[in-house]
């Protein structure tokens, strides 16, 4: 069975893993998923990730991050732009998510980046997801 939205599947697996208080979560790997994980790691939402090969299929394993008292570092993670309805935004229309406590992850001509980095580079793009 083929998946229509691999990114939404990854975000759902991460969200469910945090709700279940898991330490790691794994899923099939792709370039866009790795780019999104780079942004999440740079912004401090996940600890680390590694990519491994099993039976000629690439898998990514993500080490989830929790606070000292056991709270998840990600409270919300939602897909914005979907295969059936793409959402594009100029940077001036992206106001701070949750009063700048959360981020939008964008796919821009300069690569996948957070809204903070996009504001610095003054570039908009497709809004992949929002994280808080």
Swiss-Prot record:
Q: InterPro entries recorded for this chain?
A: Ribosomal_uS8, Ribosomal_uS8_CS, Ribosomal_uS8_sf
Extract the coiled-coil ranges from the record.
none
Gene Ontology molecular function terms on file: rRNA binding; structural constituent of ribosome
Cross-referenced SUPFAM superfamilies: Ribosomal protein S8
Report keywords, A-Z.
Ribonucleoprotein, Ribosomal protein, RNA-binding, rRNA-binding
The record describes its quaternary structure and partners as: Part of the 30S ribosomal subunit. Contacts proteins S5 and S12.
Q: What does this protein do?
A: One of the primary rRNA binding proteins, it binds directly to 16S rRNA central domain where it helps coordinate assembly of the platform of the 30S subunit.
Its family remark reads: Belongs to the universal ribosomal protein uS8 family.
- State the protein's name: Small ribosomal subunit protein uS8
Q: Which organism is it from?
A: Rickettsia massiliae (strain Mtu5)
